[in-house]
């Protein structure tokens, strides 16, 4: 069962965040923690906290499964653009240049590599019962 964690309005540009997000996409969670701890970029701190939140959410949903036994991996990570904070910087001859401070939203989905089987209804038994029914076939004449 998958767990989702979202980071909203992070004060880093989406382009910079995607560089680090691409490093951990599809990687196991423990390896992703190692990658993020050794990454010098500021956005790695945000992604590490987000990954911790996603793992905690998965653990809360699956309390019957031990976290050590589960092989968690990052199923999807998506970095979207959020709003912009617009500023004006004075320029020569009475003009102004616009400064756009970009924000982003990150969505992280964590799932288990090992699929735990759920009990399935026995469809073979119901198929056998249907085929064993006796059917009386007549040709339409009275005898």
UniProtKB/Swiss-Prot annotation:
Cellular component annotations (GO), alphabetically ordered: cytosolic large ribosomal subunit
GO MF term (any one): rRNA binding
Record keyword Cell membrane present: no
GO biological process: translation
A Pfam family that the UniProt record links to this protein: Ribosomal_L22
Alphabetical keyword list: Ribonucleoprotein, Ribosomal protein, RNA-binding, rRNA-binding
InterPro entries, A to Z: Ribosomal_uL22, Ribosomal_uL22_bac/chlpt-type, Ribosomal_uL22_bac/org-type, Ribosomal_uL22_sf
Xref: SUPFAM superfamilies: Ribosomal protein L22 (SSF54843)
Region entry Disordered, spans: 124-143
Its job: This protein binds specifically to 23S rRNA; its binding is stimulated by other ribosomal proteins, e.g. L4, L17, and L20. It is important during the early stages of 50S assembly. It makes multiple contacts with different domains of the 23S rRNA in the assembled 50S subunit and ribosome.
Quaternary assembly: Part of the 50S ribosomal subunit.
Family membership noted in the UniProt record: Belongs to the universal ribosomal protein uL22 family.
The protein's name: Large ribosomal subunit protein uL22
Organism: Amoebophilus asiaticus (strain 5a2)
Gene: rplV
